[in-house]
């Protein structure tokens, strides 16, 4: 949890008025059972945990009602919140991106749609109000043009919207380099084509940095849509490789000040899936760095 204070008053006092709630994603803990990952993340002092909705953690197809109840009870016992359900990858039946929202094969596309519907229902049962997902999918191998791909994406999302609205869960699009929606302008163009208030944004700090965006300006630009943040650092070359906060060149002090300025009061989840051999260590180091920021 990061606290940002006002500058000193004339009496030398600080008035604390903003707290950043920090979470850690279980997708770094793929070599651990979900129960163990939640326990470790809680023990380290994080405010929340992001749950991976894929193997080996919480793929809906492998989650019985009893299993969901066990996880919900564990979260309650550990005194930790669910920051987000991460429904981006689909290794259970495909890979990191496939099946995607924009598959030309309707049967494959339907698998992504149904997966997201089940994640939305599971989110409601676990007490989470948000589910993050991929921004359409890869466009390199498609024979469709951009306009057709956007229509396919929107048509696919539209099938999930009624369930999301009924369950009062928001679906967060996560722009990523080299996928259909990469940057802020493409995201805004998408939102202009979608009417439902349940479609919002998962602002991945590293992703926007990789595509050349000014992070602070982009946060202001997209503030009305942001429901959750992903945190990782990125090298000066802006290569899409997640690094521990503090090991790259992202100016986290400025980023957190901007998050404060726009009035965001949700969770920021540290996402370090490349570090599956030492997840507890990187989770601890990340929390130490972020809590040590003097903003």
Language-model features: locations:
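Short hydrophobic alpha-helical segments enriched in small aliphatic residues
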Residues: 6, 12-15
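Histidine-acidic metal/acid-base catalytic patches
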Residues: 14-23, 28-45, 69, 76, ...
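Active-site acidic/histidine proton-transfer and metal-coordination neighborhood
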Residues: 35-36, 77, 92-200
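Non-cysteine beta-strand/loop elements that form the S-adenosyl-L-methionine
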Residues: 47-52, 83-87, 132-134, 223-235
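Short strand-turn motif at the edge of the Rossmann-like AdoMet-binding core
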Residues: 52, 85, 175-176, 206, ...
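Glycine-rich, proline-tolerant flexible connector loops at the mouths of alpha/beta enzymes
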Residues: 52-72, 135-141
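A short acidic, helix-capping loop that chelates divalent metal ions and anchors anionic groups
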Residues: 56-59, 93-98, 139-144, 210-211, ...
């Amino acid at each position: 949890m990061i606290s940002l204070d006002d500058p000193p008053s004339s009496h030398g006092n600080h008035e604390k008025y903003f707290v950043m709630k920090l979470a850690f994603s279980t997708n770094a803990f793929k070599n651990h059972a979900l129960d163990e990952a939640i326990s470790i993340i809680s023990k380290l002092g994080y405010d929340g945990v992001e749950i991976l909705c894929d193997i080996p953690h919480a793929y809906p197809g492998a989650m019985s009602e009893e299993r969901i109840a066990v996880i919900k009870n564990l979260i309650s016992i550990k005194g930790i919140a669910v920051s987000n359900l991460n429904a981006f990858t689909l290794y259970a039946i495909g890979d990191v991106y496939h099946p995607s929202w924009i598959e030309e094969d309707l049967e494959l596309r339907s698998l992504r749609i149904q997966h997201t519907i089940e994640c939305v229902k599971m989110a409601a049962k676990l007490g989470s109000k948000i589910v993050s997902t991929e921004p359409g999918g890869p466009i390199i191998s498609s024979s469709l043009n951009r306009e057709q791909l956007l229509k396919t994406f929107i048509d696919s999302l539209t099938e999930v919207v009624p369930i999301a609205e009924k369950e009062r869960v928001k679906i967060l699009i996560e722009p990523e380099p080299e996928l259909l929606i990469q940057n802020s302008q493409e995201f805004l163009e998408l939102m202009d084509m979608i009417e439902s208030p349940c479609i919002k944004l998962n602002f991945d700090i590293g992703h926007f940095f990789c595509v050349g965006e000014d992070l602070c300006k982009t946060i202001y630009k997209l503030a009305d849509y942001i429901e959750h943040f992903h945190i990782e650092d990125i090298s000066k070359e802006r290569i899409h490789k997640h690094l521990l906060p503090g090991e790259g060149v992202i100016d986290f002090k400025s980023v957190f000040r901007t998050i404060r300025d726009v009035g965001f009061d949700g969770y920021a989840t540290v996402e370090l899936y490349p570090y599956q051999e030492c997840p507890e260590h990187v989770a601890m180091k990340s929390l130490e760095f972020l809590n040590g920021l003097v903003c």
